[in-house]
Swiss-Prot record:
Keywords, in A-Z order: Mitochondrion, Transit peptide
Protein name per its UniProtKB record: Required for respiratory growth protein 9, mitochondrial
Listed Basic and acidic residues bias regions: 265-275, 282-297
Biased composition (Polar residues): 229-238
Organism annotation: Arthroderma gypseum (strain ATCC MYA-4604 / CBS 118893)
Family of the protein in this entry: Belongs to the RRG9 family.
Region ranges (Disordered): 71-97, 189-297
Function of the molecule: Required for respiratory activity and maintenance and expression of the mitochondrial genome.
A Pfam family matched in the record: Neugrin
Listed transmembrane segments: none
Highest taxon of the lineage: Eukaryota
Classification via PANTHER family: NEUGRIN
Length: 297
């Protein structure tokens, strides 16, 4: 029994020493345990300096080094990436923008809807807009009129708001100017051959002027055509049959010169061609000359 108790006591001593190494307490020198009440009554006045033997401190240092929880040291690559992220990134130098690109961007910013020029409205159209709006302001509202006449709503609003009206003299002057403009445009188109009919009504004082302009334009076209039209018409009316210059006929007499022309005869020798009824046969030629004057065929 004594041997068993001794071995048990030794085991307890070893366990206490191991416990002191793992969980150090204020009194390392004594092997007695400190009750929990002592920790509750502990204060700063009763605090005593901790005295730790040298061998125990070394063992405790080795234990902490073996089970260190410090983060692993960063590699050179990771440290380089961190420094790159921390450093402020320098903006890349922009390429110089050409002048045409600057102008294009400015136009895009100014005209966001693109090329949409303002539409001009004639005085007659403005008067009709006012009449429609006065007839039914709900049906012919500013928005509906703008969609119908393809102009902005602001332009419709200004037309309805304006109180200016042309006098009778100004209206007559405007009508005359418009008539002259129509005639000028029509004359130009007829000279170019783009229009052959007169769309303007013949009623009114300008009918004589229109007819004179039309006659002048037609005569100008005929004079420009000139002889070319007459020649082409003559050729179309009387087409001539092409003659083979190597066909032998009764007109082939000794001493004649064959050529490759269409008539196959020199013009100075035969100025006028004889018709088919006046052609002389070889028999007539032989009878006229007699047997001695027989040609060398």
């Amino acid at each position: 029994m004594s041997s068993q108790t001794l071995t048990a006591a030794n085991v307890f001593v070893v366990l206490r020493q191991l416990r002191s190494l793992c969980y150090p307490i204020p009194s390392f020198a004594s092997s007695q345990t400190i009750p929990s009440r002592a920790y509750s009554n502990y204060n700063a006045a009763r605090h005593t300096s901790l005295v730790v033997p040298a061998n125990i401190a070394i063992k405790q240092w080795h234990f902490a080094a073996a089970y260190s929880t410090a983060p692993p040291s960063k590699t050179a690559k990771e440290s380089g990436e961190d420094t790159d992220l921390l450093e402020p990134t320098k903006p890349k130098p922009k390429k110089p923008v050409p002048a045409w690109a600057v102008q294009k961007n400015a136009l895009k910013e100014k005209f966001k809807e693109g090329w949409k020029p303002r539409k001009k409205v004639s005085p007659d159209t403005m008067e009709s807009i006012r009449k429609l709006h006065s007839m039914d302001s709900v049906k012919f509202s500013t928005k509906n009129l703008a969609e119908e006449f393809k102009i902005s709503a602001e332009a419709i609003r200004r037309i309805l708001k304006s109180k200016w009206r042309a006098t009778e003299e100004e209206e007559i002057d405007r009508r005359n100017r418009w008539e002259k403009r129509k005639l000028r445009i029509q004359e130009q188109m007829m000279e170019l051959g783009l229009r052959h009919t007169d769309p303007i009504s013949k009623e009114g004082p300008s009918s004589d002027m229109e007819s004179s302009h039309r006659n002048k334009s037609s005569s100008a076209i005929e004079s420009l055509a000139g002889e070319y039209l007459s020649q082409s018409r003559g050729q179309e009316s009387s087409p001539q049959k092409r003659r083979d210059p190597w066909d032998v006929t009764a007109d082939d007499l000794p001493g004649t010169i064959r050529t490759s022309t269409r008539d196959a005869w020199p013009q100075e020798r035969f100025p006028e061609r004889r018709g088919s009824s006046q052609r002389r046969t070889r028999r007539d030629e032989y009878i006229e000359r007699g047997p001695r004057g027989k040609p060398d065929w």
